[in-house]
Amino acid sequence: MSDYIVVKCGGSMLNQLNDVFFECIKKLQQKYKVVIVHGGGPEIDAKLKDCNINVEKRDGLRITPKEVMDVVQMVLCGSTNKKLVMNLQKHNLLAVGCSGCDGNLLQIQPVSEEIGYVGEVSYVETALLKGLINMEYIPVIAPIGVNGNEIYNINADNAAAGIAAALGAKELVFITDVDGILHEGNLVKETDESEIATFIETGVITGGMIPKVQAALASLKMGVQKISIVNGTKDFTEVTGECIGTTVTKGVSIA
């Protein structure tokens, strides 16, 4: 068991996770060293509404002034993270929840002043993750990062891709509520960058699948070798540890 695998679970999926999901994580842990990264968008939006703070986004990123950052940190590092940790442990999967600010795990580069405390991963302190895994814990990471003495919000896709690239992970798995990319009703088991562009142009990929594949493409650019888009409400792992869904790779360069 030498290869790492990073599992990214968006905030909209956290309340849909069932026993099947946790059994899949058990199967993955038998073959790989597992790291989980989670989001928390719906919970953050709800808490901001409770606090009478407007929810604003630009180009898919949450505009995060200081008062929003305080709420983001509270939700991601608090209730959301610990709920997932407790669900894992309920299924006999030992987990440790932490955020990217713990041990300077996720160091970031700010995106722009206009959107506030939002950053993209620039460095990952992998020794912390490896230490937890060597003690047989599953690290459960909230996507908060640091720059100097300031805490920043990180898009969970970017956080997961940064961690996967830094660990040299075998695979980054995006947990969704669909089986993968479908073409004429059939699952596309393997695809690459150029074919995805064609799928979008021809309308094979539409709606909510577009941001999922865009996240996969962005992960490839960050150095991740293989991304799988799977349905977290079903059994998405073979006994071999391979994922059932759509696998995205860079493809072959003819340059």
Swiss-Prot record:
GO biological process: arginine biosynthetic process via ornithine; L-arginine biosynthetic process
Annotated localization: Cytoplasm
Enzyme Commission no: 2.7.2.8
GO molecular function, one term: acetylglutamate kinase activity
Pathway note: Amino-acid biosynthesis; L-arginine biosynthesis; N(2)-acetyl-L-ornithine from L-glutamate: step 2/4
Residues with site note (Transition state stabilizer): 8, 212
GO CC, alphabetical: cytoplasm
Record bears the keyword Zinc-finger: no
SUPFAM superfamilies linked: Carbamate kinase-like
Residues annotated to bind substrate: 40-41, 62, 153
The keyword Heme is annotated on this UniProt entry: no
Keywords associated with the record: Amino-acid biosynthesis, Arginine biosynthesis, ATP-binding, Cytoplasm, Kinase, Nucleotide-binding, Transferase
Catalytic activity: N-acetyl-L-glutamate + ATP = N-acetyl-L-glutamyl 5-phosphate + ADP
Pfam assignment, any one: AA_kinase
Family according to the record: Belongs to the acetylglutamate kinase family. ArgB subfamily.
Protein purpose: Catalyzes the ATP-dependent phosphorylation of N-acetyl-L-glutamate.
Protein name listed in UniProt: Acetylglutamate kinase
Annotated organism of origin: Bacillus cereus (strain ATCC 14579 / DSM 31 / CCUG 7414 / JCM 2152 / NBRC 15305 / NCIMB 9373 / NCTC 2599 / NRRL B-3711)
